[in-house]
Curated annotation (Swiss-Prot):
Zinc finger (MYND-type): 546-587
Phenotype of gene-disrupted mutants: Produces partial defects in sexual reproduction and suppresses an apsA deletion mutation. Changes the colony morphology and inhibits sexual spore formation.
Primary localisation category: cytoplasm
InterPro entries on file: MYND-type_zinc_finger, Znf_MYND
Basic residues bias (residue ranges): 139-149
Gene3D superfamilies linked to this entry: 6.10.140.2220
Annotated Zn(2+) binding sites: C562, C565, H583, C587
UniProt source species: Emericella nidulans (strain FGSC A4 / ATCC 38163 / CBS 112.46 / NRRL 194 / M139) (Aspergillus nidulans)
Low complexity biased stretches: 152-167
Localisation: Cytoplasm
Name of the featured protein: MYND-type zinc finger protein samB
Annotated function: Involved in determination of the onset of polarized growth and morphogenesis. Plays a role in the regulation of branching in hyphae and spore formation.
Ranges in a coiled coil: none
Length: 590
């Protein structure tokens, strides 16, 4: 039988195509993939911009043809995937931008089973990935625990041998006479070893330095004319509550001292040695910077310079002293390493946390990380059709991609499940990624449902639906199991033989949970609120919001409303308790 590729020889075309200025229904019957993709690409533009094209598609069988393309299923072939994505985009454009009659025709063209299958596939993928991620995380924790226990035993053995050796050395050293006692001033607390030539360096005379508890003041020129000796004694003065006595030659300007710089005793005990360096302005001989011979551990957190601090008092700080410090550092040509200060950033407290961060940075694979997001303050009746979608069928994975013409829309974040499977490189996983529903497909499905579900006369299509066999991914999900044998191809059942026993509202309600993206949760909440609309054609009665019940009111205001959202109605307390598991996610106060 000849293919249905209508050629146009007079314009040198192998088949009939849809362009941005010409719509031809025959182009949708083309069996060749490439010209059909070109036609669908232009049709996606026409369905967005032309209301007449949307109306024509509802009467010439164009919508039915697009739905048939969708029901053929997705394939691993890139061209087939592109064709499916473009057809889906066209149907969404028709349903979202069309009138009530156009939306009714989209539902009557059997588009609801396609949406139900997409949502069900996505939920199954999430459950599968969450289960695998939890098992892998548990195995990783057991491995880390075993890895930590083994070095601990070896360290205890080495420590015991080292203690024995040191005790033997102490026994031999006790035979020597004790060393001569050397008097050390009480304000010197440096415990580090000093070079031999440091004894010849005379220490400057030290005046008793005290300061009030609130603020300490001293001359700002004391930093300027200090001699830059290669080695200084590091000391710290005890704080007292008196005004320091200073010479007039030291400088007349006074500079306020901040509490975070004046209280080194608040530092952790592990850094007392570093904190005892004379960097605080309360120490008269403390230098404003550290020399190159002072070794600071790499793992310590450097305190920002004084110019980055904000004043803790209402007065303005004088920056001349700080400028002179910066000039000294620049002119000396030596590296400036500030000592450790109070922790004001996100620090790592212990070795366990540090190792966890290092492991997370060095780990090249992506684990499942579900972000807890909420969507507050959104109106239930507000619709937004400006979410960006792939008109050309390409997969959008840009973290900073914003919705078109919508500044308030959050950025589209790549799915953590796609990142999880992308790093597990095997044949089964790569084939599964091609058939896995994308987040934009789920988002457009929920968006289309939000527009067509508000018509109560179409509610039976949503509550009595089915799944499309060629779109289901149960076989691909079974291939992801570890040690799974190849699944034999089973002859699929005909779709028209399947019973309509699927209610789409429970599937949509699962997307109102907080671990989904904000856009998904928003559109899912809109769909669920449409379920609570009253049917004007039946006298304004409402249906019980518990999908397992489905009872209708016999008269208006028979059922009681939810006290929180004042929108949903339940026929009894039992139905309300049964539905609260997911209703709490979309139960918003009016």
């Amino acid at each position: 039988m000849r293919e249905v590729n209508f050629s146009i020889p007079n314009v040198n075309k192998a088949s009939v195509n849809i362009t941005t200025t010409l719509y031809d229904r025959r182009a949708l019957d083309c069996t060749s993939t490439l010209p059909l993709i070109n036609s669908l690409n232009h049709l996606a533009y026409l369905t967005t911009s032309s209301a007449r094209i949307r109306d024509i598609l509802t009467v010439d069988g164009g919508i039915e043809r697009l739905v048939c393309i969708l029901k053929e299923g997705r394939s691993n072939n890139l061209m087939e995937m592109w064709k499916w994505s473009l057809a889906f985009q066209c149907v969404v454009n028709i349903g979202v931008r069309g009138s009530e009659n156009v939306r009714t025709r989209v539902v009557e063209a059997d588009m609801v089973p396609v949406i139900a299958t997409i949502l069900d596939n996505y939920i199954k993928v999430m459950d599968k990935v969450r289960a695998r991620s939890d098992s892998e995380a548990q195995r990783h924790r057991h491995h880390q625990l075993h890895h930590k226990i083994t070095p601990t035993a070896s360290d205890s053995t080495s420590r015991s041998s080292f203690s024995d050796a040191s005790s033997n050395e102490q026994r031999t050293s006790r035979r020597q006479p004790p060393p001569t006692h050397i008097e050390i001033p009480p304000f010197f607390h440096d415990t580090r070893a000093v070079e031999s030539n440091a004894a010849d360096v005379p220490s400057p005379p030290r005046a008793p330095m005290t300061s009030p508890p609130e603020r300490s003041t001293f001359g700002q020129d004391t930093y300027a004319h200090r001699s830059h000796a290669p080695l200084r004694h590091r000391a710290i003065q005890p704080l007292a509550t008196a005004i320091p006595s200073m010479d007039a030659a030291d400088g007349s300007g006074l500079r306020p001292v901040r509490d975070t710089e004046r209280l080194p005793s608040m530092l952790p005990a592990a850094f007392n040695e570093l904190a005892s360096q004379p960097d605080s302005p309360t120490t008269p001989s403390g230098a404003g910077h550290i020399r190159s011979n002072v070794h600071v551990p790499i793992g310590t957190h450097a305190r920002p310079p004084l110019s980055q601090h904000q004043s803790t008092s209402g007065d303005s700080d004088d920056a001349n002293g700080e400028d002179s410090i910066m000039a000294d550092d620049t002119g000396s040509g030596q590296s400036r390493r500030p000592i450790i200060g109070l922790q004001s950033r996100m620090d790592i407290d212990d070795d366990a946390d540090r190792q966890t961060v290092i492991d997370s940075v060095t780990d090249s694979s992506h684990d499942l990380t579900v972000t807890d997001t909420t969507s507050d303050g959104q109106e239930s009746e507000t619709f937004n059709i400006t979410h960006r979608s792939a008109v050309d069928g390409s997969i959008i994975t840009n973290d900073n991609a914003q919705a078109v013409n919508n500044a308030n829309s959050p950025p589209i974040v790549p799915s953590p499940y796609s990142l999880y499977f992308r790093d597990r490189t095997n044949i089964a996983t790569q084939n599964f990624l091609n058939t896995m529903p994308r987040e934009e497909d789920v988002l457009m499905s929920l968006q289309l449902l939000a527009y067509v579900s508000k018509y109560c006369n179409l509610r039976s299509y949503f509550q009595n639906s089915h799944f499309v066999p060629k779109l289901k991914i149960d076989r691909e999900l079974r291939m992801l199991d570890e040690g799974a044998s190849p699944v034999e191809l089973i002859e699929e059942e005909d779709e028209y033989l399947l019973p309509d026993d699927v209610n789409i509202f429970p599937l949509v309600e699962k997307f109102t949970a907080r671990h989904h993206s904000k856009d998904m949760s928003y559109w899912a909440c809109v769909v669920m609120r449409n379920l609570c609309r009253k049917d004007e054609s039946r006298g304004g009665i409402r249906q019980c919001a518990n999908y397992k019940c489905g009872k209708w009111e016999e008269f208006t205001r028979q059922f009681a409303k939810c006290r929180r959202c004042r929108r949903t109605k339940y026929c009894s307390k039992d139905c309300q308790k049964a539905a609260w598991l997911y209703h709490r996610h979309w139960c918003a106060t009016p």
